[in-house]
């Protein structure tokens, strides 16, 4: 049976332990995701306390990180989601995503409504992917795919 968290504290403390153990052991996020049958982005989000993992994946990841049965239980718990407390993010990388939505949010909203109608794009029935590609002009580019199910607004 899955259990729900009542505050973000336990998962946040676990995330700090995950990051420390990952660094101590020289593991990558991909190393942790390999063999779970779950997307890299979802496993990483779970490690940061934003998703629950199935038992087998939680056990595998916890074992790789040298964590105990309590950690396995926490990794399976349904978290209080939302990792940016206090409004506008101050971390430069996270802020760029915030900035993208500040610039393109109303455009995305208008295009979603024009193409789909009144509704939302789900962040629950959702897939996220990130790829590093070479930029023909030099350097690298990040290709980020947000793939969410459209949910129409229904009158009641």
Swiss-Prot record:
Which GO annotations describe the biological process of this protein? Answer: cyanate metabolic process
Give the source species. Answer: Pseudomonas aeruginosa (strain UCBPP-PA14)
InterPro entries linked to this entry: Cyanase, Cyanate_lyase_C, Cyanate_lyase_C_sf, CYNS_N, Lambda_DNA-bd_dom_sf
Q: Keywords in UniProt for this one?
A: Lyase
Q: What does this protein do?
A: Catalyzes the reaction of cyanate with bicarbonate to produce ammonia and carbon dioxide.
Annotated protein name in UniProt: Cyanate hydratase
This enzyme catalyses:
cyanate + hydrogencarbonate + 3 H(+) = NH4(+) + 2 CO2
* Entry EC number(s): 4.2.1.104
Entry keyword Zinc: no
- State the similarity comment: Belongs to the cyanase family.
Gene3D superfamilies documented for this protein: Cyanate lyase, C-terminal domain, lambda repressor-like DNA-binding domains
CDD domains membership: Cyanase_C
């Amino acid at each position: 049976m899955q259990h729900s968290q009542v505050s973000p504290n336990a998962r946040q403390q676990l995330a700090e332990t995950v990051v420390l153990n990952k660094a101590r052991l020289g593991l990558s996020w991909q190393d942790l995701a390999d063999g779970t049958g779950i997307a890299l982005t979802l496993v990483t989000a779970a490690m940061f306390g934003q998703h629950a993992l199935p038992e087998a994946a939680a056990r595998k990841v916890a074992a790789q990180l040298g964590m105990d049965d309590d950690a396995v239980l926490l990794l399976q718990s349904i978290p209080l989601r939302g990792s940016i407390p206090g409004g506008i993010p101050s971390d430069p990388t996270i802020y760029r995503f915030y900035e993208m939505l500040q610039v393109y949010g109303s455009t995305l909203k208008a295009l979603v409504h024009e193409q789909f109608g009144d509704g939302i794009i789900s962040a629950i029935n959702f897939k996220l992917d990130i790829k590093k590609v070479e930029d023909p002009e030099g350097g690298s580019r990040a290709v980020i795919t947000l793939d969410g199910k459209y949910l129409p607004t229904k009158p009641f």
